[in-house]
């Protein structure tokens, strides 16, 4: 019987598994996918998340491979409304790290394999979960064979459509959303290599973030979900709103509709939720993966204590539930504000929005805003 089985081998699940392993726990990761994804997906690693990477000895390796985003600029109608620096808000790491998710996952998997060789299992599907009071049983299928695994605790890190959450009977409560976007990565062109740019334009927000290898991530709000859009369609939106002409690209485009949900509870007996299984947050603002990592930073020591001193389990896991649900609610409010600011605006609303941006971009408000955008409060 394992100490902990983590269901879901994405960036949140594998980071948590590493944090448990460095504490000496017997941990195993079950991942449904047979092969890792090669999509860039989440790219931003905020300063508080660097603490988790430091615990695993990965902070330097991540920073070496990444682009450091040291600040951002907000523009409208070809003019800068305000600039923001992360220098004062971010402490030891005065920047947001930009690295494609597949590279981050590869580093995490390699480190976990060093800590717990052979304990990352891919191509495994969970079909049932049963909390027996003193342990959890998982029914799984692997290569057509059904088996039962046991652990003292099971952690659901299996994403927004979490099978474990559903099997445990935990509801997800919707908290707004519905805005739609297109996203893709393009050759960088002439924009500053360490600066994010937000275009608060009349037709909706366009966002641009640097990536390693001379590329940039571009995101644009759309009036409806456009699942068949191409990179040329996104480039046309960017040019029409901002005047920026993107280089031709054959990269795939992601069309997504924002969903925000919070699980009614994060702990059910010996089953614990983390990441998108616990809270689904708008990706606008780059909070989702980081929020899950901060879950892991709190949950790893809590589970270690609960296993070694069982009498503390109810208290430490209740504290985890309370604190991380509170952080998720704060993140959802901030994500809602980010989306509201990026919606189409004309006339008085446009002038009021631009005025608010100018106000927030100067001290003392700028320091507060920088802390919020670098997730110092979560």
Residue ranges and their predicted role:
Residues 41, 45-111:
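Active-site-adjacent segment of FAD-dependent monooxygenases/related oxidoreductases
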């Amino acid at each position: 019987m394992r100490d902990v089985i983590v269901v879901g081998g994405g960036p949140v699940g594998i980071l948590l598994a590493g944090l448990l392993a460095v504490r000496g726990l017997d941990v195993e990761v079950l991942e449904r996918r047979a092969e890792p994804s090669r999509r860039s997906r989440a790219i931003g690693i905020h300063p508080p998340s660097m603490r988790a990477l430091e615990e695993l000895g990965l902070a330097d390796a991540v920073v070496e491979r990444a682009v450091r985003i040291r600040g951002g600029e907000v523009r409208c109608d070809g003019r800068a409304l305000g600039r923001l620096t992360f220098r004062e808000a971010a402490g030891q790491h005065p920047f947001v790290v930009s690295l494609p998710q597949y590279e981050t996952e590869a580093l995490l998997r390699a480190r976990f394999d060093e800590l717990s060789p052979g304990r990352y299992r891919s191509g495994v599907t969970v079909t049932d979960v049963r909390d027996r009071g003193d342990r959890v049983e998982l029914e799984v299928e692997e290569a057509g064979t059904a088996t039962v695994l046991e652990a003292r605790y099971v952690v659901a890190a299996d994403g927004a459509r979490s099978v474990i959450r559903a099997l445990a009977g935990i509801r997800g409560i919707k908290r707004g959303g519905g805005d739609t976007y297109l996203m893709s990565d393009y050759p960088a062109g002439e924009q500053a290599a360490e600066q994010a740019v937000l275009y608060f334009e009349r037709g909706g927000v366009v966002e641009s973030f640097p990536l390693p290898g001379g590329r940039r991530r571009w995101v644009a709000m759309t009036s409806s979900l456009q699942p068949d859009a191409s990179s040329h369609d996104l480039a046309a939106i960017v040019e029409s709103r901002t005047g920026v002409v993107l280089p031709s690209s054959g990269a795939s485009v992601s069309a997504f509709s924002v969903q925000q949900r919070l699980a009614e509870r994060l702990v059910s007996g010996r089953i614990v939720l983390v990441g998108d299984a616990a809270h689904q947050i708008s990706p606008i603002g780059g909070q989702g993966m980081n929020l899950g990592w901060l879950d892991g930073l709190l949950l790893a020591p809590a589970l270690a204590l609960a296993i070694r001193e069982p009498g503390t389990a109810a208290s430490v896991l209740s504290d985890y539930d309370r604190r991380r649900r509170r952080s998720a609610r704060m993140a959802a409010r901030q994500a809602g504000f980010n989306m509201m600011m990026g919606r189409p605006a004309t006339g008085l609303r446009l002038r009021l929005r631009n005025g608010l941006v100018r106000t927030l971009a100067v001290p003392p408000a700028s320091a507060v805003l920088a802390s919020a955008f670098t997730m110092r409060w979560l």
